[in-house]
Regions:
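A periodicity- and composition-biased signal for non-globular, repetitive helical segments
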Residues: 11-12, 568
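Active-site or pore-adjacent capping/gating segments
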Residues: 565
Length: 573
């Protein structure tokens, strides 16, 4: 009988050891000696400076400012995001979230940071009955439009297919038919968020509503990393017309005057922009109606007849075809493959010094959706950008000033005057953190390409600065946070207006140690990484490091107590 008891007790002892080993095998970044060891334990893919592909991994689409993070990671689930944030915290590195990689100032791949690129978190689950979708936080807009279209739905957001959904929502998300439905953030119902300490929170109108408010238009790289969104969907429009009017700079002042006086006050069903380069002007639009109705709206403005206007109209596009229309230089509705940009849509980055990029004709291969072709990899952009909002009032003299600036457009420069108003005019500026609603008539985006050669680039920079100095006083002072500009005197005020102080309070609540500090949006400074105290850990000190990746929790203490009792029992047998 004694031997049976001993066998039973030994078996129980081994079983309890197994339980303890399982229960204390939680991820503990402080148990690893180096950052690479910690990141390897997360099982997320990672690229380091000496690895093949580093030059491509370390930057997104915009390469004017080349940053040097310590590593770029690619999680595929929320747990990995949590662990990566904890690794960065433990080793005094800033966790820097990246979605689409479109930051104008490189804020999604900051120096010495751990970049957490969520672009592989791109799942889409649609509930047709409720017209909602649960979407991975890293998906890009082109693939999202395709997946939603399969079920007969869409959302409101930007035309550019490589833009990330989370980045769009963090910027507000103005896009096609925002005058009818609002911005992308207005369609968000809920977010799953990894916060600064690696915890996961749900944010919606009831749970953590202040965080939910901030995530929609409060700027990227702040508050937390959204790993999943729940979106309200919109049924695909039954009838619509897309159009493009080209003027070749004939009668530009008349075009600008007529456009300015008409577009803002037009029907909510029409989305329209005035675009000008150094060799032509065009008006691009999307109308929720037929061609006859479109003429009834636009003909009284004379915009179809100014100078040598050439109009191209389509009323037979599919929904995806109309999306592709706006990025197709030939203005057709046939190139749906342009939207199918996958998860790695950019061509090569040529080094630490931004250079003039050349086109890449290699098709995208990673993450493309079967049956839709594949977009070509897009060249990365070395551009300088300015953004400003205008109220309705603009004098004849102001129109003339803009006309004269447009006539001297720098080679390759691009300006886009986009119409706001519509439903946005009826919304309070604090509906979400995105404030550019009531009182905003137009948004002006100006971009000039750069080469990386200071001598060659000087005229282009002088030109864009002239626009800034001349037109900023005519604007309402606001700028779109999606087009970050390091030259702004008070970026937080320009991006968020009266919402800035509330955003600071929310940021302090959910990120008291300023862990997510990549962008300039809240006028904050980056904490030192060389201090004796760790600024990323509450209380200042990083977790103690142990040789094994285990953590003793309350359950573990219970199991250990049971083991000790078993040992006592064994001794007394």
């Amino acid at each position: 009988m004694g031997s049976i008891k001993r066998v039973w007790c030994i078996s129980l002892f081994l079983y309890l050891i197994l339980l303890v080993g399982t229960s204390i095998a939680d991820f503990v970044p402080g148990s690893y000696l180096t950052l690479p060891q910690c990141i390897a334990a997360t099982e997320a893919s990672a690229v380091y400076p000496n690895d093949p592909g580093w030059q491509d991994a370390k930057v997104g689409e915009r390469i004017r400012i080349q940053r040097r993070p310590v590593v770029v990671t690619y999680p595929i689930n929320t747990t990995q995001v949590q662990w990566l944030v904890q690794c960065a915290n433990s080793f005094k590195r800033m966790p820097d979230p990246r979605n689409g990689g479109h930051s104008n100032i490189g804020s999604s791949s900051m120096d010495n940071s751990v970049v957490i690129d969520i672009s592989y978190m791109d799942s889409v689950v649609i509930d047709a009955a409720t017209q909602t979708a649960v979407v991975g936080g890293g998906i890009r807009l082109g693939p999202l439009y395709i997946e939603l279209d399969k079920a007969g739905f869409t959302i409101i957001s930007a035309n550019h297919p490589t833009v990330g959904l989370s980045g769009a929502i963090a910027s507000g998300g103005f896009g096609l038919q925002s005058r009818k439905y609002g911005v992308t953030g207005d369609l968000a119902l809920e977010a799953e968020v990894v916060t600064a300490d690696g915890s996961v929170l749900i944010a919606n109108a009831i749970t953590n509503p202040d965080l939910f408010w901030a995530l929609r238009g409060g700027g990227g790289g702040k508050y937390g990393i959204v790993t999943q969104w729940k979106l309200q969907l919109i049924p695909i429009w039954a009838k619509f017309t897309v159009f493009n009017i080209i003027y070749f700079y004939t009668g530009f002042e008349e075009v600008l005057t007529n456009f300015w006086n008409w577009a803002y006050g037009s029907l909510d069903d029409i989305s329209v922009s005035l675009i000008f380069t150094n060799n032509e002007i065009n008006i691009q639009g999307h109308f929720l109606g037929g061609e006859k109705d479109l003429h009834g709206i636009v003909d009284p403005t004379g915009l179809f007849k100014v100078g040598n206007a050439k109009a191209v109209k389509h009323n037979d596009c599919t929904h995806l075809g109309s999306r592709a229309y706006f990025i197709d230089k030939d203005k057709t509705c046939d190139k749906i493959y342009l939207l199918n940009v996958g998860t790695s849509p950019f061509g090569p980055n040529y080094g630490d010094v931004p250079t003039l990029q050349t086109a890449d004709v290699t098709p995208v291969t990673e993450g493309v959706i079967e049956g839709y072709g594949a977009a070509l990899k897009q060249q990365r952009e070395n551009v300088k950008t300015k953004s400003m909002f205008f109220a309705k009032e603009l004098s004849v003299e102001n129109i003339t000033t803009i006309t004269e600036l447009a006539k001297t457009m720098a080679y390759g420069a691009h300006a886009e005057l986009t119409t706001y108003g519509g439903i946005l005019e009826t919304q309070l500026t604090d509906l979400t953190a995105f404030p550019h609603r009531n009182g905003v008539a137009y948004h002006l985006l100006l971009e000039v390409p750069l080469t990386g050669n200071a001598t060659i680039d000087e005229p282009a920079l002088n030109y864009i600065n002239t626009w800034e100095e001349t037109l900023r006083p005519l604007s309402n002072g606001g700028s779109y946070v999606g087009y970050e500009d390091e030259d702004l005197t008070n970026p937080g005020l320009s991006y968020f207006g009266g919402n800035l102080e509330t955003l600071k309070q929310i940021d302090s609540k959910y990120d008291p140690n300023n862990v997510f500090n990549a962008g300039q949006s809240l006028n904050q400074t980056t904490p030192s990484l060389t201090t004796d105290k760790c600024p990323f850990i509450a209380g200042g000190d990083p977790p103690g490091r142990r040789s094994t990746g285990v953590k003793i929790n309350e359950n573990s203490l219970v199991y250990i107590t049971q083991i000790l009792l078993t040992i006592v029992l064994l001794i007394n047998l």
